[in-house]
Amino acid sequence: MHQPLTRTRQLTMFGIATAAAVALSACGGGSSFDEEPGASGDPSEDAGGTAALDILIASSGDAETAAVTEAADAWAAETGNTVEIVVAQDIAQQLSQGFAGGNPPDVFYLDAARFADYAANGSLEPYADQIEDFEDFYEPLRQTFTFEETAYCVPKDFSTLALEIRTDSWEAAGLTDADIPTTWDELADVAQTLTTGEQTGLVIGDTRDRIGAFMVQAGGWVIGDDGTTVTADSPENAEALAYLKGLLEAGSLKYPSQVDSGWGGEAFGTGKAAMTIEGNWIRGAMTNDYPDVDYMAVELPEGPAGKGTLQFTQCWGIAADSDATEQAISLVQYLTEVDQQLAAAEAFGVMPSRESASAGYLEQFPDDAAFVAGGEYGQGPVNAPGMESVLLDFDTGLQQLASGDPAQILGTLQSNAEAVIGQ
């Protein structure tokens, strides 16, 4: 069922300057470590020793750095090991250099969009099956970090997309809770109703990281579940792009650049957009930069195939060449326990990747219900190696969707993806 409407003046979690990065950078950690060592029967029981673990993270700010450091130090104190936390300035570059130089960190943040590249070249230790209660992680997140039928690593946390609506614009248009859009047709109707001379009904990012949600709602995606079949030019994807093209032509949908904004959250906060589609990271940006704006967060409307959203996540990667694999697995087990994930949520606002932690999270952040719901049905990034340049080219096509041909845009994606994946 569609989540009920909520109004919120959100608590501070993330600044607008890091809003884009926050969707892809978060950790499991916190300040409450009440369990006795090994109390849950997890791998930490057998991790005693004197291993020195290097941990590379991409932090969203001081709160995240402090949380992951405190959690790792607590594990080290319990097990007799040592840890060194390195906060990367550019984690993609530093991780690549570490592997290329034969000196990767033992444990590290690994973005879902880059996971397949590292899994394919043998850089990762496939440890996921050694984590207790692995099935407790949301199934779509587990699939995101599965390559060639092997689950490699466990997600630290995750974000999803939802529909944000300004309550002042909603009420000024005479709309009520009964008008919350639950279908594409209803979204088109309210977007048109909310479009005025100075405000666009809906403003969303002009890349696959927002538009892709509509492809999922139509029953499509770039590749099939097997990770090897390219499905870009499917009728379902064409239907999604045609729908959005219609809204762009009607003027009820615009991209941020069309309203002199850097991203959807800025257009939303300044009132240039009545609605936007962003992740739960928007909460901090709104609080920090637009504290007087009341808004609602609801699940994305269903498409022809039903519900659909996108998931953004990172896993705790472990280097295949680590000399302390056993201890690294123990650390990851510790960091991803329910109490640690809830402590991380309290410290800097990330959503737990374990289903059993969702109730506790919603007690802290009830207004995030729409985002949490996406954990059950969200779509992760394209899970195939070598696709980054192909997807960037797809983004370029999407940016020209208003004047472009959906079939041509998808056809180009199909041929480019097949060339990489080897179809």
Predicted regions span which residues?
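Hinge/lid segment of periplasmic solute-binding proteins
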Residues: A112-A162, T196, F214, D292, ...
